Each structure stands twice: as C-alpha cells, then as structure tokens.
Amino acid sequence: MLQPKRTKFRKMHKGRNRGLAQGTDVSFGEFGLKACGRCRLTARQIEAARRAMTRAIKRQGKVWIRVFPDKPITEKPLEVRMGKGKGNVEYWVALIQPGKVLFEMAGVPEETAREAFKLAAAKLPVGTTFVTKTVM
C-alpha cells in the first residue's frame, strides 16, 4: 500500500479539509475519475480501487494514481484511558477536495474505461464522475 518512505515528523495535527482542489484536469491519460465531494481516502481504499480498475481492463492500457496518502492518522489502543500522549500511527490518508482527479487511464476504449471507473468508484467513500481529456 501507499505511504511515504520518510517524513519530517511522525505525527500530524488533525487539521481541516477546506479549500479548493489542485489537479482538476486530466493530465496524463485520456479518461479520469473526478471526486465530487470532500473526503479522506485511505491507502487501503486507493489500493482497492486500483485493483478493481486493473482487473476490469484486464491489465491493458495504463493507469495513473493522482492521489497519494501523505497524512498519518493515529489511534489509541482499545480500552486505554485518555491522556498519556498521542496514539500510534495506524494508517495514512489523502485529503480530497471537490474536483480532484483521483485516477486516470489511457490505452483502452471509453466503454471499458467507464466500466472500470464504475467498479473503482464503488470502493471509494466519495461521489465521483467520469471525465475525458479536453484538447484546447
């Protein structure tokens, strides 16, 4: 699963997921899966969506993952009293804003790409839409 190789600090504040998305256009492939809302995508969810897509296109074409989980989420163990410091890092998330392109695909027909993205979207906790590359 995806996670940073090294970070400056082990743990991070919770923070807020506000603002506008960067990376709202299809850059690498022909088709894309764009987020319609805000969420935190875990590394497991990204991997599950990637597997669903690659199986649907039968390993033809190319898939780009445009998000990376770089925020550590900590949890305290079960039945532990409050206090005594921050919990251990349990998993990594990527903060998603509306309009962010999550995945891109090229080298497959549009119908195949739509079907693959539909399967991938079922694994994600946010509403998504299918987008195509616009040539200026």
From Swiss-Prot:
Alphabetically ordered keywords of this record: Ribonucleoprotein, Ribosomal protein, RNA-binding, rRNA-binding, tRNA-binding
GO biological process, one term: translation
A molecular function GO annotation: rRNA binding
Claim: Metal-binding is one of the keywords in the record: no
UniProt-listed InterPro entries: Ribosomal_uL16 (IPR047873), Ribosomal_uL16_bact-type (IPR000114), Ribosomal_uL16_CS (IPR020798), Ribosomal_uL16_dom (IPR016180), Ribosomal_uL16_sf (IPR036920)
A Pfam family recorded for this sequence: Ribosomal_L16
General function of this protein: Binds 23S rRNA and is also seen to make contacts with the A and possibly P site tRNAs.
Subunit description: Part of the 50S ribosomal subunit.
Annotated protein name in UniProt: Large ribosomal subunit protein uL16
Species of provenance: Yersinia pestis
Lineage start: Bacteria, Pseudomonadati, Pseudomonadota, Gammaproteobacteria, Enterobacterales
